[in-house]
């Protein structure tokens, strides 16, 4: 049931589910204790709107804040749903700043482990929209199979 709800809630977004315990990514080593508890990652990506020249710095900040809020809402909802079904789940928080160390790396790791993109210039780049995606992540032990949408 959880997987169906996840797919429905994320139908307008990039969505991938990966098994981090089988990931070949080098960065998984630094998260070994977390992955032992939460071996699967649900990666959710929201496409950013096209950039405008007018007030681009301000509009970028507003866009990231809005998408961060959306991602926080979605990931908390999904982690609560998984916990209600008896699984462990952790909504990885979105920070106010885009480049926030550990959580930023976890979002990238989850997205590339789910084959939603590849790393270029230290960013996740998707085939569909390049790097214009903001990522959110839920870590869980729920037995939801790997998927890419």
Question: Where are the predicted features?
Answer:
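Catalytic cores of enzyme domains
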Residues: 60-149
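Non-catalytic, usually N-terminal nucleic-acid engagement modules in DNA/RNA processing proteins
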Residues: 1-63
């Amino acid at each position: 049931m959880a997987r169906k709800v996840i797919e429905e809630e994320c139908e307008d977004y990039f969505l991938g589910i990966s098994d981090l315990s089988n990931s070949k990514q080098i960065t998984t080593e630094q998260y070994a204790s977390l992955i032992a508890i939460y071996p699967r990652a649900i990666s959710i990506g929201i496409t950013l709107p096209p950039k405008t020249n007018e007030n681009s710095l301000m509009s970028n900040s507003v866009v990231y804040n809005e998408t961060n809020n959306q991602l926080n809402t979605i990931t908390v909802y999904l982690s609560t749903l998984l916990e209600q079904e008896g699984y462990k789940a952790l909504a990885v928080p979105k920070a106010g700043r885009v480049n926030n160390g550990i959580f930023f790396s976890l979002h990238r790791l989850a997205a590339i482990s789910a084959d939603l993109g590849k790393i270029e210039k230290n960013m996740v780049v998707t085939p569909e929209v390049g790097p214009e995606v903001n990522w959110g992540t839920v870590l869980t032990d729920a037995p939801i199979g790997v998927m890419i949408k």
